[in-house]
Amino acid sequence: SEGVSITMQNSIKAALLIGSFVASSALAGVSPELAAQLGNTLTPMGAEMNGNEDGSIPAWDPAGPPIPAGYEEGSSNYIGMYPDEEPILVINGSNWQEYKDNLTVGTIGMFEKYGADGWELQVYPTHRVSTRPDWYYANTAKNATGATLVADGQKIEGNYPGLPFPMPQSGLEAIWNHMIRFSKDINQDYDTYYVDSSGKPILATSAHSVSVYPMFRKTDEPVGDEIWTMLRIDYNAPARRAGEILLVHEPGADYTAGKGRKAWQYLTGQRRVRLAPAVSFDTPNPGVAGTTTYDDSFVYNGSPERFNWKLVGKKEIYIPANNNEFVFETKLEDALGPKFLDPNVIRWEKRRVWIVDSTLKEGQRHLYSRRTFYIDEDDWVAMAGEMYDGRGNLWRLQYIYPAVQYGNETGFFSSYGAYDLLQNIYNLNGKPIPGRFQNGSGGVSDKFFTPKVMARSGVR
């Protein structure tokens, strides 16, 4: 298609050729004929290349995100890309029912509860500017025919560092796309708040975090046992948590027994590092004062083993998008309203999303009986979700506030938060303090992400 680079097209074709040999194995991905749509009618990531009928969703722009005038080249301060745009639509308490078909169940729940209090969506023009490196596209094309789920969906075989399932055939494949999404190494200082039922903002955490992504270093080797991310969080507030450290190694392809997540904690009271298997699933997350679970972070993370996953289909939905101004430029304290984030700081766009519904497996335990996810077709990130309690009531809902790291190699970064409709509280996590976000690991080596070095840091 026009605009897709010749290099990219050639690398996709070569990958499809390799993939067609792999595809002869019994459980492989889609047929080479289907996969040939990548880079043609579908983007290299499997999204629909074209816009929608009424033009409210444009065609994908392979040129990538624009560089705004005020951006300093090489800086990690990714200011808003569309500073002169105004909302083209405001969906509020008086008109939301007209737009019901394009709202998530959670957003409808917010209007029902807070529409009269000023909850609204400020909708801006849609910009589909998400791009990835050419090697990532080539690996994605290879994966389309060669990657396959085994071990009851707990493991991917035959995948290279790219999107594992650009043309998903199941809910499990779609959620794996979200779980091992493309990311760049970063380090940041951030504050996490929750707002209690009286409308008071409470600091849950101040911390420094470093995330690196080993899986995307060796671009021409299968993922295998490689780690998707190593994350280390050093806490400095509140006082009772100052000095605590959390370390997580998250797999790139394998959650089978003995594999999967490895987590360690350094607790100042114990003055030692210990394995922390409870840093997973529905354990309340102290990073947000227990207001959501560990597996709520980034809307969903971790092993998919406790749920049945269903791919419901695709829909046009209003979700947060291109929120650089909020994520990188806005002071969080200024955005915290008594019942919800200030609607003036959040940018919404109409997007095509994959809807994935998950229900708790028989015999499994979890606080949530059901969860629904809305996965953006361009980024393959769950931008919104809903969590239901054991009685089937809508309990919590979440949004990711995505931002684009533009420039040399486009990256995806996000903050995220949840609303609790039963307890009337909400939280916001992972938003950098303005000016305190940096690309790269901040000069630390991979040893920094080991229990040994963590123990030394803790003792200091």
Residue ranges, per PLM feature:
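Short alpha-helix boundary/capping motifs
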Residues: 1, 70-71, 291, 408
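Short, Lys/Arg-enriched N-terminal segments with co-localized hydrophobic residues
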Residues: 1-7
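N-terminal signal peptide c-region/cleavage motif recognized by signal peptidases
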Residues: 23-25
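Solvent-exposed N-terminal domain segments of exported/luminal and surface proteins
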Residues: 32-260, 267
